[in-house]
Amino acid sequence: MSFVDQASPKNEIKFEQKPLIKSLQDLNIVESWKDGKLKSTTFYHVTENEEVFFGYTSKNKRETSIPEFNSALQRVQDQDIYPTIPADTHLTLAPEGLSASSVYVKRPGLQWYEEMIGTDYLPKAVLDETMVMEQISQSPHENIIRYYGCRVRRGYITSIVLERLDQTLSQYVTTSDFQELDKVKFFESLKSAVEHLHTLGLAHNDINPDNIMVKNGSPVLIDFDSCQPFGKRLQSLGTEGWYEEVFYTSEKKHDIYSLEKLQEWLQAAK
């Protein structure tokens, strides 16, 4: 396992040349609609060196040609989306050469980039989740997603690398395997993971079926971008329908409520 100390973004390598997009598969594309009409199409491309190119158009993706996509792409400055490493911080570097099929590389929420330009929302979100995963990795739990480490490029934390699992609980309940599930054991395993977080002084704050993966019939808790120490102010709230009331700080009671609701949901699922 490798560690990295604080690095300075001053020693940056030169940016890569603007990428040549050859097909829509080279892009992540989000179409924004309102009242049945297209507002805009945003798209981005991430290079192998974690450089991000972003663009938008008023056309839908089917009406936009590959040359038009290429022309619209502009380099996003690292500091707009990635955090630098805080002083006196030791980070676990994800091993190079991990199979792409076995890991999930979690990057900043670039679908929010255009809306959040000029704020520190995206860099802070990456840093917060990285530091939480570092803390959890020092006291791992079998029902919490495995953290391999983060990636650092040009002095910035560009992504975190996690175990890849294929099925959320929302998806799992629609399969025949769900009929054989020991719901009591499943829930107790999930509860154990949440209680483990609480012993670390952390609340997840967003427990719902889409943030629980299923591995060999057991739950694995994921998505720690709202997980913070008790009492800390949050940037993002829980998922609508899974919290008792709107909240702005991290609290154990949010998890307790969500667990109770999830237990009811699990028992009702057929």
Identify the meaning behind each predicted range.
Residues 128, 189, 258:
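Charged catalytic carboxylate motif
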Residues 104, 109-127, 134-137, 143-186:
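Conserved structural core of kinase catalytic domains
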Residues 198-215:
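Catalytic-loop of the protein kinase fold
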Residues 2-71:
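Long, solvent-exposed N-terminal ectodomains/accessory regions
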